[in-house]
Structures are given as C-alpha cells and as structure tokens.
C-alpha cells in the first residue's frame, strides 16, 4: 500500500484535477483563450498522476475480486496465480506513483564535470587516481555516454595529480553525483619493495555542468592570463603561450588549461570548468546558509567525507554510506558500478520518502 502522506498528496491532486476539469467545461474559449490555454496545461500535468492512480485503484479492486475466487475450490489455483500477477502489477504502479510524486534533483538530467585529485599517499595516490579515471571511463562506455578529458596533470609513473573530465549523456548527474567524496585505497604499491600495504586517498568532485543560463559571469570579474604549456617534470612543451589561467576574482576560483594546442581551445575548456565550479560554489553557499538557519548539520557527500574503500588484498569494495560491501574489486574498477549506484539511489529515494 502507498504511504499515508503520498495518499494525501494524491487526494489533493485528484481534487485539483476535478476542479480544473470543471472550470474548463464551463469556460467559453472564444471569450478567454489565455485562461483556457493555462487550464489545459494544468490539466495535462495533473492527468498523468490521475491516470496512474486510476490504474492503481483498478488493480486494488481486481485483487479484492480475485480473493473472492479463492473460496471456490475449482478456481483457487487459477486465482492464486492471478493474485501473484496482480500484486506484482500493484507494486510496479506504487513505484511509478512514488517516483512521480517524489521531489526531483533539478540537476539530475545534466551532464557533469568530474574532477579526480590525488590526496594523501604521494605517487601511489596518483596511480590510483589513474585507476579511478579508467573506472569512470569504462562506466561511461557501458552507459553509452561521451567521455572527454578536459585537463590532466600527469606524473612520471603514469598517475595523475589531477584530472578533469566531461561526461555527457542521458541523466549522467543522477548516476554520478554519489561519487563526490574521498575514495580510499589499501594495497601494496608498485613502488613498495617490502610488500607492505599502504593506505592512500583520492578526492572526487562531481559537478553538474553549467552555462550562462545557470550562472551569470561579469567579464570584469575575470582575470585571464596566458603562459607556455609544460609537461610532466616541468619542461616546456610549447614555444607559444597557449596555456590559459582564468581566475574569478570575487570567489578566487582559478582554472588552468594547457592540454590543447591553441589558446582559444584552452580558454573555452577553462570557461566550461569555471561555470560548473561557480554553480557548485553558489549552491553550496546557499545550502550552508539554509543549514545554519535550521541549526542542523546534514551529510551530503562532501569532499571531506570518506565514502568508499578499495581493499586489494581482500578483493573488497566497501561503500561506507550504506554499509555495502562487494567482493568483486576488479569488476568495479572495470566500470561495474551499477550495484553500488542503484543502492545509493534507493537510499536517496528512501530518505526523500521519509521527509516528504
């Protein structure tokens, strides 16, 4: 059965649906076309839930009617099978209603800018940053998403001090938003001769991609600098000043890009990252103000929170937010993140239901 608070929401919607339908029926379209158009739009939005709820009630009635057939010995076996089928349909319809009535994250349909940075652990942390980059790339391939490296700061052994990528596709943020936080790796580094297990950390930030419709940037607030691009070890790899650094003066947020050969391409990439960073900055600022007003602390998967551990010797991945442990480390690193992400999505839905 649907939770009481959801039934109350549906009853309100049913009442609005009936009222809107009544207003439309009594309205003269020739005299008030604008009102007719507005009411028609409202009715269309309400009708989806109205039809779902009508289907839900029909299944409930069918279940009650089928239960009556259980009293007939000749029809009992057939009725039991039909009840099983109807209960499955009822659960599916409940999920549809709950999903449509649950508040959505406005960013869920957006593409993302994903940033991976080596934390504690030196070269080993940088090497695991490369492993995580590959993991997200494989996951994107499984989903049919477009994956593009925007900026990378490589180390001599093939790791990354920092790497920033864009991932584009259907509902990317709704899947990857849970990856923001500290990822911990426990393994014997290739640089370790004594065979001792080391613990290193990597931070991941997942930002919904933004543009000028999400964030207004005053050109006067930007300081744009150019310099010669350099490779691993600091040697210059370009004789022209193609690298670009853009600083947003009011917030102090600074973005550098040097992977492209032309200054224009690097500038476009830097602005793309800056828009996402500023959107994230202002949203967090707004949330902090709201939390302060409510006098409460809410965990949101911030970068300072340890969210997941990858233990190589035990072939184990543990997500600490939901106490989920999987013994298929290599599969996860090969992009098999569905079990983890679907569990996190279920937890988010559960929390939304509790607070609805």
From Swiss-Prot:
The gene is prfA. InterPro entries: PCRF (IPR005139), Pep_chain_release_fac_I (IPR000352), Pep_chain_release_fac_I_sf (IPR045853), Prokaryotic/Mito_RF (IPR050057), RF-1 (IPR004373). Methylated by PrmC. Methylation increases the termination efficiency of RF1. Peptide chain release factor 1 directs the termination of translation in response to the peptide chain termination codons UAG and UAA. This is Peptide chain release factor 1. Its main location: cytoplasm. One of its GO terms (molecular function) is translation release factor activity, codon specific. Keywords: Cytoplasm, Methylation, Protein biosynthesis. HAMAP family: Rel_fac_1. PANTHER family: LD18447P. SUPFAM superfamilies: Release factor. It is found in: Cytoplasm. Belongs to the prokaryotic/mitochondrial release factor family. Pfam families: PCRF, RF-1. GO terms for cellular component: cytoplasm. The modification N5-methylglutamine is found at residue 235. Signal peptide: none annotated.
């Amino acid at each position: 059965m649907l939770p009481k608070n959801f039934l109350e929401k549906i009853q309100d919607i049913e009442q609005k649906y009936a009222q809107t339908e009544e207003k439309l029926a009594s309205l003269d379209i020739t005299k008030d076309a604008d009102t007719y158009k507005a009411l028609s739009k409202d009715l269309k939005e309400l009708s989806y839930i109205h039809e779902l709820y009508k289907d839900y009630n029909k299944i409930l009635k069918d279940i009650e009617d089928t239960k009556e057939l259980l009293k007939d010995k000749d029809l009992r076996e057939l009725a039991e099978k039909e009840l099983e089928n109807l209960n499955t349909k009822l659960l599916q319809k409940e999920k549809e209603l709950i999903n449509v009535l649950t508040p959505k994250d406005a960013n869920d349909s957006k593409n993302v800018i994903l940033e991976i940075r080596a934390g504690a652990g030196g070269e080993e942390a940088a090497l695991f940053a490369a492993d995580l980059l590959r993991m997200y790339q494989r996951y994107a391939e499984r989903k049919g998403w477009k994956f593009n490296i925007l900026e990378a700061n490589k180390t001599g052994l093939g790791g990354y001090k920092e790497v920033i990528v864009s991932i584009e596709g259907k509902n990317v943020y709704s899947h990857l938003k849970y990856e923001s936080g500290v990822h911990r790796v426990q393994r014997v580094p290739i640089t370790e001769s004594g065979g001792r297990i080391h613990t290193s950390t990597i931070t991941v930030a997942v930002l919904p991609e933004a543009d000028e419709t999400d964030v207004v940037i005053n050109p006067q607030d930007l300081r744009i600098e150019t310099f010669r691009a350099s490779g691993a070890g600091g040697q210059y790899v370009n004789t022209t000043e193609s690298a670009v650094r853009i600083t947003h003066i009011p917030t102090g947020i600074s973005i550098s890009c040097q992977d492209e050969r032309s200054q224009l391409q690097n500038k476009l990439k830097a602005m793309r990252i800056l828009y996402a960073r500023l959107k994230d900055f202002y949203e967090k600022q707004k949330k902090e103000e709201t939390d302060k007003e409510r006098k409460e602390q809410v965990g949101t998967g911030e970068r300072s929170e340890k969210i997941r551990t990858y233990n190589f010797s035990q072939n184990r991945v543990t997500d600490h937010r939901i106490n989920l442990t999987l013994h298929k480390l290599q599969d996860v690193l090969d992009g098999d993140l569905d079990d983890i992400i679907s569990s996190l999505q279920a937890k988010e839905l559960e929390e939304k239901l509790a607070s609805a």
